Amino acid sequence: MGVFNVEDEITSVVAPAILYKALVTDADTLTPKVIDAIKSIEIVEGNGGAGTIKKLTFVEDGETKHVLHKVELVDVANLAYNYSIVGGVGFPDTVEKISFEAKLSAGPNGGSIAKLSVKYYTKGDAAAPTEEQLKSDKAKGDGLFKALERYCLAHPDYN
């Protein structure tokens, strides 16, 4: 098994606590509202905390697919959230899981800095994700982040 790590950082004009609420606490209901391709996020097992399994259903290339998220950490006090994608329809068979560790902190002018660590765990001697795949995955993640940021900005009473 290989482990391939990618670090990323993105800033927002939205305050950390409000952004965390949109990205984590309310994500299951907000995300399908702000991203057309995402049809639903539902809890399959658990209560939303560590160990919870969520099913995210989406449409890609005209085909309905889903991935399973396993929640590993929900730390509201420290604005941290960790989860792994552990399977699903359309999930690469060469990958065991993709783990995400996210943390929000105070940024300039009352905004936020989001730090993200992504680890790809490949099966056997499978190759690392291609540069094209990494760029595609980053674009999807950035798109989700910015869509939820736009929601917060468009709804100033959201807190």
Curated annotation (Swiss-Prot):
Coiled-coil spans in chain: none
GO biological process: abscisic acid-activated signaling pathway; defense response
Keywords: Pathogenesis-related protein, Plant defense
InterPro entries in the cross-refs: Bet_v_I/MLP, Bet_v_I_allergen, Plant_def-hormone_signal, START-like_dom_sf
Induction: Upon contact with the plant pathogens fungus Fusarium solani, Pseudomonas syringae pv pisi, and the fungal elicitor chitosan.
GO molecular function term, any single one: signaling receptor activity
Pfam families per UniProt: Bet_v_1
GO cellular component: cytoplasm; nucleus
Database matches in PROSITE patterns: PATHOGENESIS_BETVI (PS00451)
UniProt cross-references to Gene3D superfamilies, sorted A to Z: 3.30.530.20
Similarity section: Belongs to the BetVI family.
PANTHER family: OS08G0374000 PROTEIN-RELATED, STRESS-INDUCED PROTEIN SAM22
This protein's name: Disease resistance response protein Pi176
Organism: Pisum sativum
